[in-house]
């Protein structure tokens, strides 16, 4: 797992905890902040996955051209 992916997973967990705490306490602002943090972190994770896939495809093409 890449460092960026690990960081995204930690941010997702943190956002989920904030969202859950907001739901439990009725703090809509904390709940919303947690949801946004979690969603942004998931987007970063998906971007990192796409980057890795493209790098893998480029490497495969380079190998075939040798």
UniProtKB/Swiss-Prot annotation:
InterPro entries: CsbD, YjbJ_sf. Pfam families: CsbD. Residues 1-23 are annotated as: Disordered. Coiled coil: none annotated. Residues 1-10 have a biased composition (Basic and acidic residues). Belongs to the UPF0337 (CsbD) family. This is UPF0337 protein SPy_2005/M5005_Spy1709. The lineage of its organism: Bacteria, Bacillati, Bacillota, Bacilli, Lactobacillales.
